[in-house]
Curated annotation (Swiss-Prot):
Mg(2+) binds at residues 485, 491. Transmembrane segments: none annotated. This is Polyribonucleotide nucleotidyltransferase. Residues 689-774 are annotated as: Disordered. One of its GO terms (molecular function) is RNA binding. It catalyses: RNA(n+1) + phosphate = RNA(n) + a ribonucleoside 5'-diphosphate. Residues 700-755 have a biased composition (Basic and acidic residues). Residues 621-689 form the S1 motif domain. The lineage of its organism: Bacteria, Pseudomonadati, Pseudomonadota, Alphaproteobacteria, Sphingomonadales. It comes from Rhizorhabdus wittichii (strain DSM 6014 / CCUG 31198 / JCM 15750 / NBRC 105917 / EY 4224 / RW1) (Sphingomonas wittichii).
């Protein structure tokens, strides 16, 4: 029934298996990729015809993580996979970026690439496997894909590169780098690093490129066994005559437009030239009109690229290494915890930093289960930033991707949660854009955190590099404009500190670049980053020592683990009382770390003292402030040190006699008490009478000690016999004759109600003690 084809290789200490012919057989190409016990299915389908009037390549990539792959049921009300998560969006882009340039120009058939994680073993990450499966499925599908590509993840630990490291390896190491490459050159790089040098980063890319060659060979072997017949491409029409006509018509207009340094003026001039070209083909067929528009764009690219390669002159008049003018301003917004306005040429970002408590952390539900992220960065790109009318609302894939890139750049310099126990949210609202808005987000975000008082290791700056490549001639350009991005061959973003690189992202629009070009771009980017750091330092060169007056304060303390339940109380009673009474928020971790937060330091101090009182042990002889919680006939129970209870006996309330406890004390009354004794069961005996209730100072004990009452000679009581265990009254021995107490008849009988030396009978005495026997 199945015509299964399979290829296996040993790769990075694991067996990589590529299989087709058993699952999703109606797709144009479907591959089941397995690494360890992680399994990803990728299916490719392509439309056989192009929609009328379509002049772009509609490639759509969807990556989906099935919860059953790790034995989990989705959380929340809806128990099924729903819209794409942030990770799914990022991996979809990771697959899309290296394969899109490998389709021929003029191919406009719609293609769907759908990758689904079917099994996840917790060690082998499915994103790399999804990239490999997508490449293999496209290669065997018959569509005009100029691949295949290979992919690899590289870590760096103890001076050595690691192929396909586990999550634990990445966390313990200094690098998490993903590379996609063809046989000849690198196509895409995505990375996060802990301030590594350019040499180490370049070495990691080359290491990944070499490792991906084994994957490419395996895909080619699978294609030799199972590839479908390649599609026949329609011959491209000869447009040389139309191109010559357009060059004569609008060539000079385009050249003049690109000499205008102002973006708005340049756009207006270019639109006029395009309208002029379109008018010249008004009588042509719709297909010819579309072709003419494409030719105008090609003319624009030729003019810009030639000026850069031959003359070294760019659109705005800069040379290839110069960075646009920079203006940075810290504390731009008065009420934000931290803020900055960062402007580089015609690109501008308002960046803010907001500090929160643990309860503000972002909950992330994924294949590995629930986890919480205390650092967030949200990038927003409204349509007005480019002077256009457009959709305004939820972030798209591009915004999610740009935000994550800036997140990686800044994540490496954050303090640990122990050093700075705040939740940090950065936002970047792009108010102007003409290239490299994600790197403006990095610079603005770094300044905003410093303004908020976040103790980052060092400031971070970022720069976007471009490439113009014609044959063997190339020019690497620093701080690219939007037009240079569109018309160039590479978008290469590098961010880092004065000590090294923290993130690097590269997208190639041609069939890859060489090691020489890559090295040149890295070194030129280092020069640009250093310049930008200098400009940022003019606005703020150090982290502020004080937090904003509007930011919450968090104090951290540690308590013994066995005291956690005492702080929480039965059903959370104690901790709720602490929060309700003091107004501070209290979070307790399983390791005994307690975080107390409030914008009022007095509230923090009150909660802290309360908790200290719960976990501390009372000391005999010390004086504490407490609250009366219960009155009984023989005294009062007082709660002190937050969670401790002790008894003040009626005799220890005052130096003078107290007839009724309720006459001297009331429930809820605050009192000062001294610890007299703690018995071996932990019972605490307290005294109020030796403490000044106004000042809390100890008073001298003026009460005379109780004298022993003489009991007289009780005489020889005789042999009481051996004592045995059990009821003494029932089984006790002979106590001997009783001493003669004499005739009581000559003494008057005392009435119990009259009292005597021992005072009146207490009110609570039972009836048989108070009744009249006469």
């Amino acid at each position: 029934m199945f015509d299964t084809k399979k290829v296996e290789i040993q790769w990075g200490g694991q067996t990589l298996t590529l299989e087709t012919g058993r699952v999703a057989r109606q797709a144009d190409g479907a591959v089941l990729a397995t690494l360890g016990e992680t399994v990803v299915l990728c299916a490719v389908t392509a439309a056989r015809s192009v929609k009328e009037g379509q002049d772009f390549f509609p490639l759509t990539v969807h990556y989906q993580e099935k919860y059953f792959s790790s034995g989990r049921i989705p959380g929340g009300f809806f128990k099924r996979e729903r819209g794409a998560t942030e990770k799914e969006t990022l991996v979809s882009r990771l697959i899309d970026r290296p394969i899109r340039p490998l389709f021929p120009e003029g191919f406009y058939n719609e293609i769907n690439v759908i990758a689904q994680v079917l099994s996840y073993d917790g060690e082998n990450e499915p994103d790399i496997l999804a990239m490999i499966a997508a490449s293999a499925a496209l290669t065997i599908s018959g569509v005009p894909f100029m691949g295949p590509i290979g992919a690899a993840r590289v870590g760096y630990k103890d001076g050595e590169y690691l192929l396909n490291p586990t999550d634990a390896d990445v966390a313990a190491g200094d690098l998490d780098l993903v590379v996609a490459a063809t046989h000849d050159a690198v196509m895409m790089v995505e990375s996060e690093a802990k301030e590594l040098s350019e040499e180490v980063m370049l070495g990691a890319v080359m290491f990944a490129h070499k490792a991906s060659q084994d994957v490419i060979k395996a895909i080619i072997k699978l294609a030799e066994k199972s590839a479908k017949d390649p599609w026949e491409m329609a011959p491209q029409a000869d447009l040389s005559a139309a191109k010559t006509k357009l060059k004569k018509l609008v060539g000079k207009d385009i050249t003049a437009a690109y000499k205008l340094t102002n973006k708005s003026a340049r756009s207006s001039a270019l639109n006029e030239a395009r309208a002029k070209a379109k008018e010249a083909f008004a009588d042509a067929t719709p297909q010819d009109q579309m072709a003419a528009i494409k030719l105008v764009k090609k003319l624009e690219a030729e003019i810009v690229r030639t000026a850069i390669l031959k003359d070294g002159r760019r659109i705005d008049g800069r040379d290839t290494r110069t960075v646009r003018p920079i203006v940075a301003e810290a504390h731009f917004l008065p009420r934000a915890h931290g803020s900055a306005l960062f402007t580089r040429g015609e690109t501008q970002s308002i960046s803010t930093c907001t500090l929160g408590t643990k309860e503000s952390e972002q909950m992330i539900d994924g294949l590995n289960g629930l986890r919480y992220e205390h650092f967030m960065l949200h990038y927003n790109f409204p349509p007005y930033s480019v002077g256009e009318v457009g959709r305004f609302g939820a972030p798209g894939r591009r915004e999610v991707g740009h935000g994550k890139l800036a997140w990686r750049a800044l994540h490496a310099v954050l303090p640990t949660k122990e050093e700075f126990p705040y939740t940090i949210r950065l936002t970047s609202d792009i108010t102007e854009s003409n290239g490299s808005s994600s790197m403006a987000t990095v610079c603005g975000g770094s300044l905003a955190m410093m303004d908020a008082g976040v103790p980052i290791k060092r400031p971070v700056s970022g720069i976007a590099m471009g490439l113009i490549l014609e044959g063997k001639d190339f020019a690497v350009i620093s701080d690219i404009l939007g037009d240079e991005d569109h018309l160039g061959d590479m978008d290469f973003k590098v961010a880092g500190t004065s000590e090294g690189i923290t993130t690097m992202q590269m997208d190639i629009k041609i069939a890859g670049i060489t090691e020489e070009i890559f090295k040149t771009a890295l070194l030129q980017a280092k020069e640009g980053r250093a310049h930008i750091l200098g400009e940022m330092a003019k606005a703020l060169d150090h982290t502020r020592t004080e937090l904003s007056a509007h930011a919450p304060r968090i104090e951290t303390m540690s308590v013994p683990k066995d005291k956690i339940r005492d702080i929480i109380g039965t059903g959370g009673k104690i901790i709720r009382e602490i929060v309700a009474t003091t107004g501070a928020k209290v979070d307790i971790d399983d390791d005994g770390t307690v975080k107390i937060s409030s914008s009022d330091t007095a509230q923090i101090e009150a909660a802290r003292n309360w908790i200290i009182g719960i976990v501390a042990e009372p000391e005999v002889g010390k004086i504490y402030t407490g609250k009366v919680v219960n009155l009984v006939d023989f005294g009062a129970f007082v709660n002190f040190m937050g969670g401790k209870d002790g008894l003040v006996h009626v005799s220890e309330i005052k130096n003078e006699r107290v007839e009724k406890v309720a006459d001297a004390l009331s429930e809820g009354q605050e009192v000062k008490v001294k610890v007299l004794e703690i018995d071996n069961r932990g019972k605490v005996r307290l005294s109020m009478r030796v403490v000044d209730q106004e000042t809390g100072e100890e008073l001298p004990d003026t009460r005379p000690p109780r004298e022993e009452r003489p009991r007289g000679d009780r005489g020889d009581r005789g042999d009481r016999g051996p004592r045995r265990d059990g009821d003494r009254r029932r089984e006790g021995g002979d106590r001997g004759p009783r001493r003669d107490r004499g005739d009581r008849g000559d003494r008057p009988r005392r009435e119990r109600s009259e009292g005597g030396d021992e005072g009146p009978a207490p009110d609570f005495a039972p009836a048989f003690l108070t009744r009249d026997d006469d």
